[in-house]
Each structure stands twice: as C-alpha cells, then as structure tokens.
C-alpha cells in the first residue's frame, strides 16, 4: 500500500473544498484507489501532464474538480494540487 504525501499547496487547495461533501466523497474514492495501487477508472479521465506539471498525473474527480499527483519512488504518492482548470492552469 502506498502512502500519501500532501504538498503545502495541496493542503491550501483542500481547505477551499473541505465543506463540499460530494467533492470530498469523490476525492476519497480516488485517493483510496491510489493508495491501493489500483487503476483509476476511465470515468475520472486520468492522464499524464506536460509543461509545468511534467511527470504528474491528473484526473477529473467531479466535473471541473481536478486532482494532480506525482507517483514518487519508495511507495509514496505526492498530492500536488486540487481545484478547477482555471485555478490550476489558468
């Protein structure tokens, strides 16, 4: 089982959504899959990123609610960012 490392920016991003139950539940589902090293279902549109986030993965937790993570060595996944397209890329 992998461990999750929360970046400082991820923690800040998460605070914006901490009261949104639906988004938090969907996020928990994806985080559980990541920790258990299971594939992210196609409904979340998982894909590799390039540019500023080269080497990271992204998926759509719910609509325009995105998670960016980096699968590090030593069984650690770094949660990099959380938010909308405009918040993350714009």
Q: Could you tell me what each predicted segment is?
A:
Residues 68-70:
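Short, charged interaction patches at domain edges and termini
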Residues 1-63, 72-77, 87-90:
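Basic, Lys/Arg-enriched alpha-helical interface segments
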């Amino acid at each position: 089982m992998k461990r999750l490392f929360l970046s400082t920016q991820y923690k800040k991003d998460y605070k914006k959504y901490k009261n949104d139950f639906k988004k938090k539940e969907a996020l928990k589902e994806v985080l559980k899959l990541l920790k258990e090293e299971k594939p992210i279902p196609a409904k979340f549109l998982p894909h590799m990123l390039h540019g500023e986030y080269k080497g990271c993965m992204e998926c759509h937790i719910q609509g325009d609610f995105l998670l960016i993570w980096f699968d590090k060595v030593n069984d650690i996944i770094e949660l990099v960012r959380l938010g909308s397209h405009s918040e993350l890329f714009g």
